[in-house]
Swiss-Prot record:
Its cofactor is Mg(2+). NCBIfam families: PRK05474.1, xylose_isom_A. The lineage of its organism: Bacteria, Bacillati, Bacillota, Bacilli, Lactobacillales. PANTHER family: PTHR48408, XYLOSE ISOMERASE. It comes from the Bacteria. The keyword Isomerase applies. It is found in: Cytoplasm. Pfam families: AP_endonuc_2. Its main location: cytoplasm. One of its GO terms (biological process) is D-xylose metabolic process. Keywords: Carbohydrate metabolism, Cytoplasm, Isomerase, Magnesium, Metal-binding, Xylose metabolism. This is Xylose isomerase.
Length: 449
């Protein structure tokens, strides 16, 4: 690197509980500290999202972009694309993360044809690969942007226009080749326009069949070229589509099983997407892990007062603790998963160094959540709580139900003469208020040490 883009920022270190007024530093994330049998960096595998960090201009539906970035003076599109790579790898080094994620169109400008676009992209990938050799920086996942360009107005794999499907397949082919070049550990499919605006003019069955064919083609080509990445589908219920086909984890799992994709694909789950679907982040992770389909996580949060996808940096300790408890229960985020910060500063946080503060709060939030989740797991607090709640299935009629020896006739004989008073007396109170109070206590106590 010839220029220092992020001036005034040194490499960010773990400072523990020093006064945060001392500047940039991690209070809870100590990357090489071993907790729960693994280094924190291996539990969390943090990644920086190229699009939000280096391309995002902080626009919103009511105003122009406010972002001030150290490469804004560069006007030539290819010169700017190459300069962003320098700025990005300086950022990764100073932040101390091990992974990055990107869309193909984050990196280089499009040409008039796909051939020209691929040529531009390859020049940037050459530079990224050189930096990888120098730094050891890895790619958690890459993906293809098939939602921004007007050609994808009605979707890519689900477009009613066969030419658009063909173009999307050709674009994805090159994206998979790039994934192999950079050693991406996963490949993500997020279909923002793979859905519909109105059912009146939509053949929903046909569109979903086309999407499944597209995913099978992608996996087949990855196998053909030796690109051994975990394939991931990312659910989202809406926006920009009125209704997106991969609405949430459960819907996407059903789709995967319907079209025989569940052997090769897992899920990449995002906090804000979970909220838009009417779920907690923990719910979505639980659904995926219990189906053995948890692949990776996008770390961000929504705003309860705002009904759209705002991709805010995560700062909710309670939600992060719940998410990391599911990860601890799973043993890892996924076979090759990590925590990618699909997050951006607020429009009013436009200074370049706000990008560091945003990532620091996100990193510390999930590191804190991991510490609390491991402490709860170590104490067996939730395991005992759940075991006690379902203890009636350990003996008597409950054991018969579990063993599969009970049927409606035997259960009728057991229940038909039981008085209501006996049933009510056998029902235990769920002390949810006590549970939440205890979780608050774990958060406060664990993070105070």
């Amino acid at each position: 690197m010839t220029n220092e883009y992020w001036q005034g920022v040194d490499q960010i270190k773990y400072i523990g509980h020093q006064d945060k007024k001392s500047g940039l530093g991690f209070q809870y994330y100590n990357p090489d500290e071993v907790i729960g049998g693994k280094k924190m960096r291996d539990w969390l595998r943090f990644s920086v999202a190229y699009w939000h960090t280096f391309d995002q201009r902080l626009v919103d539906p009511f105003g122009d972009g406010t972002a001030q970035r150290p490469y804004d003076h560069i006007t030539d599109p290819m010169d700017l694309a190459l300069a962003k790579v320098d700025a990005a790898f300086e950022f990764y080094h100073k932040l101390g993360v091990d992974y990055l994620c990107f869309h193909d169109r984050d990196l280089a400008p499009e040409g008039d044809t796909l051939r020209e676009t691929n040529r531009n992209l390859d020049k940037v990938i050459d530079k990224i690969v050189d930096y990888q050799k120098q730094t050891g920086m890895k790619v958690l996942w890459n993906t293809s942007n098939m939602f921004t360009n007007p050609r994808f107005v009605a979707g890519a794999a689900t477009s009613p226009d066969a030419d658009v499907f063909a173009y999307a397949a050709a674009q994805l082919k090159h994206s998979l080749e790039i994934g192999k070049r950079v050693g991406a550990e996963n490949y993500v499919f997020w279909g923002g326009r793979e859905g519909y605006e109105s059912l009146w003019n939509t053949n929903m069955k046909l569109e979903q069949e086309h999407a499944a064919k597209f995913f099978h083609m992608a996996k087949d080509y990855a196998n053909e070229i030796g690109f051994d990445a975990q394939m991931l589908l990312e659910p989202k219920p809406k926006e920009p589509s009125t209704h997106q086909y991969d609405f949430d984890a459960a819907t996407t799992i059903a789709f995967m099983k319907e079209y025989d994709l569940d052997k090769d694909f897992k899920l990449n789950l995002e906090g804000n997407h979970a909220n838009l679907a009417g779920h907690t982040y923990q719910h979505e992770i639980r659904v995926a892990r219990e189906a053995n389909l948890l692949g990776s996580l996008d770390a961000n949060q929504g705003d309860k007062l705002i009904g759209w996808d705002i991709d805010e940096f995560p700062s909710d300790l309670y939600e992060a603790t719940a998410a990391m408890y599911e990860v601890v229960e799973n043993g890892s985020i996924g076979p090759r998963g990590g925590l990618n910060f699909d997050a951006k500063p607020r429009r009013s946080s436009f200074a370049a160094n706000d990008l560091f503060y945003g990532h620091i709060v996100g990193i510390d939030t999930f590191a804190a959540g991991l510490r609390v989740a491991l402490k709860m797991k170590q104490d067996g607090f939730l395991e005992k709580l759940v075991a006690d709640r379902y203890s009636s299935y350990q003996s008597g009629v409950g054991a018969e139900i579990e063993a599969g020896t009970a049927d409606f006739k035997s259960l009728e004989s057991y229940a038909i003469d039981k008085p209501q008073s006996e049933l009510i007396a056998a029902t235990s109170s769920d002390p949810l208020e006590e549970v939440k109070d205890t979780i608050n206590h774990y958060i406060i106590e664990t993070l105070s040490k």
